[in-house]
Amino acid sequence: MPYYTKLGNLPRKRHVQFRRPDGALYSEELFGTEGFVGPTSTLYHIHPPTQVSGWKNLYTTKPEYVESGVMRMRHAKTADMKPKGDPVTGRIVLYGNADVEMGICTPEAAMDYHFKNGQGDECLFVHYGTGTLFTMFGTLKFGPKDYIVIPKGTIYQMVFDERPDDGSDNEKFAGKSKAEMPYGRFLCFETANASHILPPPRYMSKQTAQFLEHAPYCERDLRIPEPPLTFDEAGEFEVRIKARDSVHSYIYNYHPLDVVGWDGCYYPYCFNIDDFAPIVGQLHMPPPIHQTFEGHNFVICSFCPRMLDFHPEAIPIPYNHSNIDSDEILYYVEGDYGARRGIEIGSISLHPQGIPHGPHPGTVEKSLGKKYTNELAVMCDTFRPMFPTKAAVQIDDESYPESWRQDHHAPLENRNGAHQPKPSAAPATPDQA
């Protein structure tokens, strides 16, 4: 996290006696990264956090990638993916590489345990649903369009609010009933290379780690943990820990969220995509101006509603471009994406490095003169190829790579009302020319 904060009760100095009301000492835990030289927080537990038992391996989490030798455009339609599992076991990895994994979760059950990802940072983007993330650092309320950044090692439980049975909220869930989407849906990113998901360094002061004036968001936009913080309960509490590409079960004889106070720079937080302030320009701006977070070898960007380019001859949609060094993945949240046709809410497009891509036929002329876009999308650019899983292939639109061929579309009108002709089936011969 970029700045220092604290919550709950703390002693005046670190590493000194801090006693409970019964006279016993609270148990101090330094919770940090990079071997004592990275961001850390210091927590004070009612019970020693080392008192665990009953450890066992539950299941493997290593994704199985397919079609690694096939390089083409991809379009996965996730809107109709069936509910599965809980907010952890229901996560379905769709694309990934050695640096980051990306997937969708539509849980059908509640978590009856707590979870710790000891393998990587998580960034969850909530598309539908509301709820509460209970963590060892306190409580985070979440709702639609929230990014939830959860640093590696955080113990938490993700609890969605119950939906009514009468269908009165179907409109808030893309028209889907409680049976079709019992709790909600979120997009998930997880680091696979032990790096951390952080704001881009160029947004931050090198002297103070404060957000700079040119940054599209700042500290005021971040929601940090709040009370309730401490759960002082006895019993058997399962904590599942992801590490070594497996999930392991441990048993605590007390509630794992027994922290009475903490301070530091390492903690989870929420950021709503509507609080991202887009940067606009006279001519079309490149994707890096939409960057929101980054990890090693990947970035996460937010394409938000905004004013379009204001040069009198501007073309307000992206130009054709080649991803020479990166793959580009877009998750479409809502609104109209002017450069694409056939895209729907919940679509995920993958444009691999080495293949030029850009506006679909006819969309450039159609965009001329537009002053505003209502698109909302989350993008992940990776600097190593992203590969699909079987789950992604099952929902893949195989016709998508051909969608740039103009003869696959009805002609569009240009600004003068004339139809754009379809290309000839074959090139003209010298006699025909």
PLM features: what roles do these ranges have?
Residues 1-433:
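Jelly-roll (double-stranded beta-helix
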